[in-house]
């Protein structure tokens, strides 16, 4: 802390406890394609750049600086000096070595390759020069000599990435967990086991290696971490982060009230009134049990349903439109989500910064038009239409009550029967990744 300035005194140490209502799928960066794995992995790994948690603007991480050519196609990154990987048996004498530009190229080449478990290659293959060709030429988990043409090591601290054309959002892609950097030695030693054996450069070190999905995760402070706060204090402040896995939001809230957890990500909607009395009362300090800290920015979360386009029924655009027009999004937001969301009537991307979502022609609630479309498709009042199955996460109460509302709307408006199936997140991801859901 700043000596003599009590306002900026920083307390070091302690254990931070939180819970996830779904288990993680994998902590191997190219395999990370959902939020829970990403939240955990980004405590252990880092990428060239990251997002500022308050402004959501891109900020340098492993890259100390970066520049963009006038054409917008060539990005040059200069790495920070003296950043080290976590100590791990994959290194000589178990001591983590210094990060260099070859590590970054190795990881990005992997991301653009057909290696086992790579679920995120599309982040770069359509953008980086030579990435698609590299992916198509890889097989049997082997990296082609020379790697991706557009990813070049200039020297130990300098890397260049050449794009096919200018992409304004390229830096934000690099903030994703799949673009995090890990050492070649770790992949060569652990292979598929990197799903739970993470070796990175981040503020915390994963201690319980080879954990199962439902076992508590324990991460300890990285004593060699490079970053400091605005006052020069070494980061992170915490000694330990513990993450448990319990899919019952009510039990999670009970543990929070008892002091067994330090944070919950979301309050169950049905518990909002009981916990906060009312949001207005809590903001005014009227609740003696909790103090409310409010962030008025939109959360980076969108909820949407996907059609399985391999199902012949949904290959008819009239049916897809009818489903869309039968859902009263504003009613769901007002009465089920208690106003704590925004109806996606202009596409599912909310207004952010300079982006005005009202320019998108979306779908408003129009059950009459929906019924006419179903008649055109040959399914008046739902007659002859097969029962559809909607697969959702079993651990998120909001998902369940929204799904039940949509189930009722589709039956009331179109006469369509929907069966809701509840799965763990890992099973759910497998089902929609392999087109096993409707």
Residue map of PLM features:
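Extracellular/periplasmic solute-recognition and catalytic clefts
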Residues: 207-220, 244-310
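Gly/Pro-rich hinge or "lid" segments in bacterial periplasmic/extracellular proteins
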Residues: 53, 133-157, 162-236, 240, ...
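N-terminal lobe/hinge region of extracytoplasmic solute-binding protein
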Residues: 19-70, 199
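Short, well-ordered beta-strand elements
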Residues: 12-22, 74-77, 104, 159-160, ...
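Aromatic- and charge-enriched surface segment that lines or borders ligand/interaction sites
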Residues: 64-123, 160, 252-255, 313
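A structural "hinge/loop" feature
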Residues: 22-38, 62, 89-95, 120, ...
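Ligand/substrate-recognition segments at binding pockets and active sites
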Residues: 353, 375-438
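Structural transition elements
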Residues: 204, 314-315, 342-377, 394-402
């Amino acid at each position: 802390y700043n000596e003599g300035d009590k306002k900026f005194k920083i307390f070091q140490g302690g254990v931070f406890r939180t819970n996830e209502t779904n288990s993680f799928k994998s902590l191997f960066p190219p395999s990370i394609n959902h939020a829970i794995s990403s939240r955990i992995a980004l405590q252990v790994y880092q990428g060239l750049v990251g997002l500022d948690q308050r402004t959501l603007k891109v900020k340098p991480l492993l890259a100390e600086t970066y520049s963009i050519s006038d054409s917008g196609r060539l990005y040059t990154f200069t790495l920070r000096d003296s950043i080290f990987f976590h100590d791990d048996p994959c290194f000589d004498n178990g001591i983590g070595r210094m990060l260099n530009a070859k590590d970054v190229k190795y990881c990005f080449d992997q991301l653009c390759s057909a290696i086992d478990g790579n679920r995120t290659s599309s982040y770069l293959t359509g953008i980086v020069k030579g990435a698609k060709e590299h992916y198509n030429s890889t097989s049997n988990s082997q990296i082609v000599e020379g790697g991706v043409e557009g990813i070049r090591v200039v020297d130990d601290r300098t890397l260049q990435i050449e794009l096919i054309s200018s992409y304004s959002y390229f830096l934000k892609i690099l903030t994703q967990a799949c673009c995090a950097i890990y050492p070649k030695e770790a992949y060569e030693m652990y292979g598929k086991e990197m799903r739970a054996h993470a070796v990175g450069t981040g503020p915390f070190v994963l201690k319980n290696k080879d954990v199962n999905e439902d076992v508590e995760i324990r991460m300890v402070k990285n004593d060699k971490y490079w970053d400091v706060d605005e006052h020069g204090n070494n980061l992170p402040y915490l000694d330990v982060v513990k993450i448990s896995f319990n899919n019952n939001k009510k039990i999670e809230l009970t543990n929070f009230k008892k002091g067994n957890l330090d944070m919950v990500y979301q309050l169950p909607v049905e518990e909002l009134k009981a916990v906060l009395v009312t949001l207005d009362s809590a903001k005014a300090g009227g609740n003696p049990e909790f103090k409310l800290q409010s962030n008025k920015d939109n959360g980076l979360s969108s909820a949407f349903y996907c059609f399985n386009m391999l199902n012949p029924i949904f290959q008819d655009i009239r049916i897809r439109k009818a489903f869309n027009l039968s859902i009263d999004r504003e009613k769901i937001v007002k009465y089920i989500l208690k106003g704590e969301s925004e109806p996606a009537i202009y596409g599912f991307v909310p207004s952010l910064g300079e982006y005005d979502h009202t320019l998108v022609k979306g779908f408003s609630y129009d059950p009459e038009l929906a019924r006419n479309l179903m008649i055109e498709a040959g399914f008046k009042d739902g007659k002859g239409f097969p029962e559809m199955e909607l697969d959702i996460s079993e651990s998120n109460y909001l998902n369940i009550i929204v799904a039940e509302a949509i189930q009722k709307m589709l039956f009331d408006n179109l006469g369509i029967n929907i069966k809701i199936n509840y799965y763990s997140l890992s099973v759910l991801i497998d089902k929609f990744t392999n087109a096993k859901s409707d």
